[in-house]
């Protein structure tokens, strides 16, 4: 079988798996969501399941039953449940003086807060792209490269975060958010005696996000630069590329039934060195199972990310990741995911952006 056909077969098999899973499973209905959300409230927050009701995917919480609980964390956790379109908190109506004759009664007050607002709020309006090789987050992975002249056994780590600085409410029960992203992505040659650093990319961004119901968008202005490891540079005498650029990009995302999400977008480089062609496009699909295993402790997840750049002749870079999310393992309110990963395309490691690579790996990822 030609090697070029392998990524297409892998993508086709992955899409077939997601389609079959979606077709075989009924959409999460309101009774299912009520039971699921109630179990989360009781298990993680010691709040009675009677505090939640569901209508067409909208969760309504009784504020009186949330007394003493971490309301912000409850909103963040329940908003992330598959099938949930919005979370509201119904406050108890305060006694009021009788209205003047002929005046209509005020409607019941309700806090339509999908997520908390203000400075340094918890949660995120735009969810992470699980298979994007350059999404800032904390991770560590082993990768095996096929047929690469320099890489075979590789350790890959990333250190990064998305930090919302301010979030506010917007018309139509939508919300907006502004913040920063930053990350470092490094790969090491594990088969070298000193485990040489091969390449490190540095990323920093200002971002704005907006969400209404199942639709969300993310726009970024960012800088990225790339650097070779000293040991590799001295040993190989390779010609170093001074790769650095600024970029703007925009991503659109929509949450579908059965835990499926689709997204797409594009980007444009400027102030780039060397003189790279500027345009790029990106799209993908994710599956976060609404159904869990092992008494709610394990959630299957899978993701496909496709990217194409003008600089590389619009060749498609294929990134596939799939595995499990451990629901009972959280660090700083982040979920731990154990994922098998496959990549075929132009290298995401900046110094080697012209090189076609293929690898298979296994990693641990912390995502919000």
Named regions from a protein language model:
Residues 124-125, 313-368:
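Predominantly the C-terminal beta-signal and adjacent terminal strand-loop region
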Residues 142-148, 165-167, 182-188, 212-214, ...:
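Transmembrane beta-strands of outer-membrane beta-barrel pores
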Residues 104-209:
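Transmembrane beta-barrel domains of Gram-negative outer membranes and organellar outer membranes
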Residues 126-132, 166-178, 255-260, 289-300, ...:
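Short loop/turn motifs that connect adjacent beta-strands in outer-membrane beta-barrel proteins
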Residues 159-165, 206-212, 250-254, 283-289, ...:
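Residues on the lipid-exposed face of transmembrane beta-strands in outer-membrane beta-barrel proteins
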Residues 138-140, 178-182, 208, 219, ...:
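Membrane-embedded beta-strand positions of outer-membrane beta-barrel proteins
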Residues 172-284, 344-346, 353-356:
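Outer-membrane pore/translocation modules
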Residues 5-103:
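N-terminal targeting leaders
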């Amino acid at each position: 079988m030609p090697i070029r056909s392998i990524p297409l077969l892998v993508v086709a098999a992955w899409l077939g798996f997601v389609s079959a899973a979606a077709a075989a499973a009924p959409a999460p209905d309101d009774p299912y969501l009520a039971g699921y959300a109630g179990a989360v409230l009781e298990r993680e927050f010691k709040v009675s399941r009677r505090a939640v009701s569901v209508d067409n995917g909208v969760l309504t919480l009784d504020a009186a039953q949330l007394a003493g609980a971490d309301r912000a964390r409850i909103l963040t956790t329940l908003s992330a449940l598959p099938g949930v379109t919005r979370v509201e908190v119904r406050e108890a109506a305060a006694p009021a003086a009788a209205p003047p004759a002929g005046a209509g009664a005020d409607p019941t007050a309700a806090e339509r807060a999908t997520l908390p607002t203000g400075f340094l709020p918890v949660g995120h309006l735009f969810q992470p792209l699980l298979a994007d090789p350059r999404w800032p987050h904390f991770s560590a992975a082993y990768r095996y490269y096929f047929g690469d002249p320099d890489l075979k056994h590789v350790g890959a780590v990333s250190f990064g975060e998305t930090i919302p600085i301010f979030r506010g409410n917007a018309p139509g029960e939508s919300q907006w958010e502004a913040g920063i992203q930053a990350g470092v992505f490094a790969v090491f040659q594990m088969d070298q005696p000193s485990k040489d650093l091969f390449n490190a990319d540095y990323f920093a961004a200002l971002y704005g996000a907006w969400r209404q119901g199942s639709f969300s968008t993310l726009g970024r202005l960012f800088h990225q630069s790339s650097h070779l490891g000293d040991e590799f540079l001295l040993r190989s005498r390779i010609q170093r590329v001074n790769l650095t650029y600024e970029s703007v990009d925009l991503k659109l995302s929509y949450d579908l039934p059965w835990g499926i999400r689709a997204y797409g977008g594009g980007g444009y480089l400027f102030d780039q060195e060397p003189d790279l062609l500027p345009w790029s496009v990106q799209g993908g699909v994710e599956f976060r199972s609404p159904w869990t295993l092992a008494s709610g402790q394990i959630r299957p997840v899978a993701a496909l990310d496709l990217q194409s750049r003008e600089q590389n002749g619009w060749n498609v870079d294929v990134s596939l990741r799939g595995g499990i999310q451990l629901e009972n393992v959280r660090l700083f309110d982040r979920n731990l995911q154990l994922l098998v990963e496959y990549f075929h395309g132009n290298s995401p490691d900046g110094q080697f952006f012209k090189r076609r690579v293929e690898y298979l790996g296994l990693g641990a990822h912390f995502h919000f």
